[in-house]
C-alpha cells in the first residue's frame, strides 16, 4: 500500500494499492534493506564526528525560541508499505518531508483498536555507510510494540536512506526539526483512518540513545508539555551545553517530563560522567530523575548479557507507569 497524506491540503492521495500478504506478512525479498529478525543488533552507536562549521546562518537561527515559533508538518507523510506482520503488531515503512529533506523510518503499530500510547525512538550516531533502518534500536522498538505502544522510529537526516543535508554545527537543530515535523504529522493524523487511528496524543513518551538522547532533550525543551516520560540511554548531555548553563541549548525550566537515565560504566564513546553530571543537574532543578549505571557495560549494552534485559525491563516499567499510567501497586 502506497499512501501519501498532504498535511497542507488535508487530502489523502492513494497512488497505488498492492496487496502482497502471504500468511499475514510481506515476503522478505520484497522489503527494503533489512536485516534478519535474529540479527537486528546491527551496528552500535559510535562517536559523533567532529565537524567544521560550514553554515553561514547565525546561531540565533538554531535557538529554542526560533524552534518554538516556527511551523512543522508542512509537507507529505507517506505510508510506503506494510513492511512486516508479527504476532502482536505490524511494522510500516514510512517517508515524510522535513523541510528540504526526505526522512525515512518505520512505525510499529499494535493490533486492535486502542487507544495506544506512543513512543518516539531516536537512534544514536552510526557511520552512515554502516547504518540500516532496522539497526540496534529495533529490538527496543519491537519490545515496546509488543507491550502495547505505537513506536515511531525515524532515520534522521544524513542516515541512509534519508536525505543527507549539509552537515553543520547547529547543536542538533536539524535532527530536532526532523522529530518536531514527525510529531506534527502524528498530531494531524491521530484518530483518523490510517496507522495512527489508535494513537493517544495524551500519552506520548520519547526514548533516545547517544546523540538521540541529546535530540530528545532538545525536543523536550521545545515541547515541555508534550512528553510524559523520557528514557536517556548513554546520552550526549554535556557536549553542546547543559540544562544549567543558560546556553539556550536546553531549557528544562518548564519541563514536567519524568526522566530515566541509563549509562554503561565502561562507555568509551560518551563518558559515564556525562550522565552522572546530568543527574546532579536535574536534582538541582528538582526534576527527581531515575539514574541507573551498569557495571562493565559499554556504550551500547551487550545484547547477550545481564544489562540489556534489565534495561529493557526498567524501560517497560517506567513507560508503563508514566506514559500508560499503570500504577506499580
Name these PLM-found stretches.
Residues 25-60, 329:
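Ser/Thr-rich, Proline-interspersed low-complexity disordered segments
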Residues 114-116, 121-164, 239-240:
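Short substrate-entry loop that stabilizes the transition state in hydrolases
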Residues 67-113:
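N-terminal cap/lid segment of alpha/beta-hydrolase-fold proteins
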Residues 195-209:
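Alpha/beta-hydrolase fold nucleophile elbow
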Residues 255, 261-263, 267:
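Short beta-strand/loop motif that positions the catalytic acidic residue
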Residues 170-193:
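Alpha/beta-hydrolase active-site loop
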Residues 276, 285-329:
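C-terminal catalytic histidine-bearing segment of alpha/beta-hydrolase fold enzymes
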Residues 130-132, 219-257, 284:
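Mobile cap/lid helix-loop segments that gate and shape the active-site cleft of serine hydrolases
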Amino acid at each position: 500500500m502506497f499512501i501519501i497524506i498532504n498535511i497542507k491540503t488535508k487530502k489523502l492521495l492513494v497512488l497505488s494499492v498492492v496487496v502482497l500478504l502471504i500468511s499475514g506478512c510481506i515476503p522478505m525479498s520484497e522489503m527494503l534493506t533489512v536485516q534478519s529478525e535474529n540479527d537486528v543488533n546491527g551496528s552500535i552507536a559510535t562517536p559523533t564526528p567532529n565537524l567544521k562549521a560550514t553554515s553561514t546562518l547565525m546561531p540565533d537561527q538554531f535557538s529554542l525560541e526560533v524552534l518554538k515559533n516556527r511551523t512543522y508538518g508542512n509537507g507529505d507523510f507517506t505510508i510506503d508499505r506494510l513492511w512486516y506482520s508479527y504476532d502482536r503488531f505490524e511494522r510500516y515503512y514510512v517517508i515524510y518531508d522535513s523541510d528540504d529533506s526526505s526522512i525515512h523510518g518505520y512505525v510499529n503499530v499494535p493490533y486492535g483498536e486502542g487507544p495506544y500510547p506512543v513512543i518516539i525512538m531516536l537512534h544514536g550516531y552510526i557511520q552512515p555507510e554502516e547504518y540500516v533502518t532496522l539497526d540496534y534500536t529495533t529490538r527496543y522498538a519491537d519490545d515496546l510494540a509488543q507491550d502495547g505502544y505505537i513506536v515511531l522510529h525515524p532515520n534522521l537526516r544524513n542516515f541512509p536512506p534519508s536525505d543527507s543535508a549539509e552537515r553543520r554545527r547547529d547543536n542538533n537543530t536539524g535532527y530536532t526539526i526532523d522529530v518536531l515535523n514527525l510529531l506534527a504529522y502524528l498530531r494531524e493524523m491521530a484518530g483518523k483512518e490510517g496507522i495512527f487511528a489508535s494513537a493517544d496524543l495524551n500519552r506520548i513518551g520519547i526514548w533516545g540513545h547517544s546523540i538521540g538522547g541529546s535530540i530528545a532533550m532538545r525536543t523536550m525543551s521545545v515541547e515541555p508539555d508534550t512528553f510524559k516520560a523520557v528514557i536517556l540511554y548513554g546520552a550526549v548531555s554535556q557536549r553542546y551545553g547543559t540544562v544549567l548553563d543558560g546556553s539556550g541549548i536546553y531549557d528544562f525550566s518548564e519541563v514536567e517530563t519524568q526522566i530515566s537515565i541509563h549509562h554503561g560504566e565502561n562507555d568509551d564513546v560518551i563518558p559515564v560522567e556525562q550522565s552522572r553530571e546530568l543527574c546532579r543537574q536535574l536534582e538541582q532543578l528538582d526534576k527527581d530523575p531515575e539514574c541507573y549505571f551498569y557495571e562493565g557495560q559499554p556504550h551500547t549494552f551487550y545484547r547477550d548479557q545481564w544489562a540489556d534485559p534489565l534495561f529493557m525491563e526498567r524501560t517497560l516499567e517506567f513507560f508503563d507507569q508514566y506514559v500508560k499510567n499503570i500504577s506499580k501497586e
